[in-house]
Amino acid sequence: MPSPLPVSFLLFLTLVGGRPQKSLLVEVEEGGNVVLPCLPDSSPVSSEKLAWYRGNQSTPFLELSPGSPGLGLHVGSLGILLVIVNVSDHMGGFYLCQKRPPFKDIWQPAWTVNVEDSGEMFRWNASDVRDLDCDLRNRSSGSHRSTSGSQLYVWAKDHPKVWGTKPVCAPRGSSLNQSLINQDLTVAPGSTLWLSCGVPPVPVAKGSISWTHVHPRRPNVSLLSLSLGGEHPVREMWVWGSLLLLPQATALDEGTYYCLRGNLTIERHVKVIARSAVWLWLLRTGGWIVPVVTLVYVIFCMVSLVAFLYCQRAFILRRKRKRMTDPARRFFKVTPPSGNGTQNQYGNVLSLPTSTSGQAHAQRWAAGLGSVPGSYGNPRIQVQDTGAQSHETGLEEEGEAYEEPDSEEGSEFYENDSNLGQDQVSQDGSGYENPEDEPMGPEEEDSFSNAESYENADEELAQPVGRMMDFLSPHGSAWDPSREASSLGSQSYEDMRGILYAAPQLHSIQSGPSHEEDADSYENMDKSDDLEPAWEGEGHMGTWGTT
């Protein structure tokens, strides 16, 4: 019976050596990858056996015996796959696997690996060697590639056998199905190999699987041994050395994991952050692309609409500002075709006078001023006979037109020669003018027949004097007669803006087409040297005269 002291010491060493040394919290979102390192990054690579436990389980769910570096295992839908990265020349040979259960201590052939340009070839069956004979017929056919000096090895029952060193012709390439059936693989240096224990897919079951590498000229090498157990069902995982990776984590993977390697135990706490089922489904199926693309499209449309409305508003404001600041758009001239008398919203507007018509008007004005000096103050002028009317109409084709203020040709009166047989009423505040009328008799002259004209170039302008106000005088600011006399009997638009008042409408009781009614010819009412107009009760009602 052993003494109790050594037993207690051994138990103490076991507890001290097996207690957790480090604890690490690993947080991952649902659907992410859980990475659990068993050793720190600075630890050297060890060939010691490691085991992974979960929770309070007494049986490890994964046991791994590392072999050569650069090897890994993948547990998934195709079975348990041995992963070899960066294949080199010395990795060619026979790869055997062992499953327990059902097989125990029985190694079954898995795959032969042939590395190109390595000088070695491996085959499971001797019948496949005939296709590798490189005679003249096979060389000329072009279906094979000569590998002169390659060493050929064939598996004979439970051991490899040297077939010979004669030249062989390796096939240019074989289909994947043929390679899977024959289990002979030819790879290029630096590629990655995925080897299964049997033809994939191989169902994954709890148990153990081991791999070994056999080469006729080198000793056998144990690669990896993996044992699956535990209470939880087997799930997809990656084992790479001392690193355990659980892809697409779920809430079932949350818990505490222990890694036992030699006398060192590493504890890992895994916390899975839950996500909504819809978001998880979108991530797994790739359906998140649909709402993201829709949202991007809506944002693009909204930005485009806002930009379009902003540009449209800026364009409208710019066009309005340009129109308001353009001096050419401040005044409008209506110039319809000459002589047609087209009616529009401005009334009976004819074409504007040309330079020739302006000169004709000036000549007629000069003749009228020389023959009848007092015709400006007569508001009623008899209409001449039909012959004179037609003659006057032929001379003045422009007819009625709006006057042009600031014109170099002088201001023109408001004329209407198209309807000489009717009474004419002036609406622009200036007197009528008919330069071609003959002098009227004394019986047809009214009280304004001997009144002075607006302007006389040979006389000096009368000084403004005070005037008397009556009910016919314009109210507001004082009226300057010299300003009235500065024109040829017509007020410009600028003067009319300063003198806005309603002219008295005086109607005559006498009937007849030879009398004209006008209320605009009261120019001499405000002369300082004349007397106030007096109303006359006899004769014509609504007229006045000077005494």
From Swiss-Prot:
Its assembly, as annotated, is: Interacts with CR2/CD21. Part of a complex composed of CD19, CR2/CD21, CD81 and IFITM1/CD225 in the membrane of mature B-cells. Interacts directly with CD81 (via the second extracellular domain); this interaction is initiated early during biosynthesis in the ER/pre-Golgi compartments and is essential for trafficking and compartmentalization of CD19 receptor on the cell surface of when phosphorylated on Tyr-346 and/or Tyr-376. Interacts with PLCG2 when phosphorylated on Tyr-402. Interacts with LYN.
Q: What does this protein do?
A: Functions as a coreceptor for the B-cell antigen receptor complex (BCR) on B-lymphocytes. Decreases the threshold for activation of downstream signaling pathways and for triggering B-cell responses to antigens. Activates signaling pathways that lead to the activation of phosphatidylinositol 3-kinase and the mobilization of intracellular Ca(2+) stores. Is not required for early steps during B cell differentiation in the blood marrow. Required for normal differentiation of B-1 cells. Required for normal B cell differentiation and proliferation in response to antigen challenges.
Membrane topology field: Single-pass type I membrane protein
Tissue specificity of this protein: Detected on B cells in spleen, bone marrow, thymus and lymph nodes. Detected on peripheral blood lymphocytes (at protein level).
Query: What Gene Ontology terms describe where this protein resides (cellular component)?
Result: external side of plasma membrane; membrane raft; plasma membrane; protein-containing complex
Q: Which UniProt keywords apply?
A: Adaptive immunity, Cell membrane, Disulfide bond, Glycoprotein, Immunity, Immunoglobulin domain, Membrane, Phosphoprotein, Repeat, Signal, Transmembrane, Transmembrane helix
Composition bias (Acidic residues) maps to 395-415, 434-447
**Signal peptide interval:** 1-16
Prosegment residue ranges: 17-18
Which cysteines pair up through disulfides? They are: C38-C259, C97-C197, C134-C169
Please give the residues the UniProt entry marks as glycosylated. N56, N86, N125, N138, N177, N220, N263
Q: Locate the Ig-like C2-type domain: which residues?
A: 20-113, 171-271
For this entry, the protein name equals B-lymphocyte antigen CD19
Species assigned in the record: Mus musculus
Q: Per the record, which residues fall in region Disordered?
A: 330-355, 376-461, 472-491, 505-547
InterPro entries, per database record: CD19 (IPR042341), Ig-like_dom (IPR007110), Ig-like_dom_sf (IPR036179), Ig-like_fold (IPR013783), Ig_sub (IPR003599)
Q: Which residues carry this modification: Phosphoserine?
A: S225
